[in-house]
Amino acid sequence: TLHEKATYGILQEFARSGLLKMLYLVSNINLENILGEVPIIGYNNKVNELLVSTVHMINVFKNSDPVMGGIEEPAEASRIATFGISDIEGNEEKSFFSLDRAKEKCYIYSINEERLKTEGDLRKKIVSTVKAQAETEDLKVSFGVFPTNYQQDYCYILNYTSIIQSDNR
């Protein structure tokens, strides 16, 4: 609706002007594509679970000490953002919103502590993946590696821009 489009644009302008510290954009369509086939009953629960668990884990890591790297604050002007996930090899990034012209990206690697202790080439893999992203996308890229007790490894992504986004829901 016209009201939604106006609000969408105004919130982005508020973020750019500094009235909002950060505006995170999320598309239900993108979340659904990440999840794959989701039944009608339970649809909202699955979509919300993906979003909430991602935001929760990013907040946990923002308040934790990495064993390598760090989560850098974005530039003052980069106040429009979205989340994403990837496998830790960086083969396929899945963004929660398709940002036009992202300027900065932060990878948050959540890796099983035992793997961090035993896998000798893991550091090299992570650094080469991050470097490749910085070169191919012409972005400022940072990353942090965090130990976990989870068996599954995860890579969370924060994408930032200062550019007003079109409504691509």
Please report, for each region that a protein language model flagged, where it lies by residue.
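Tubulin/FtsZ superfamily GTPase core signature
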Residues: 1-169
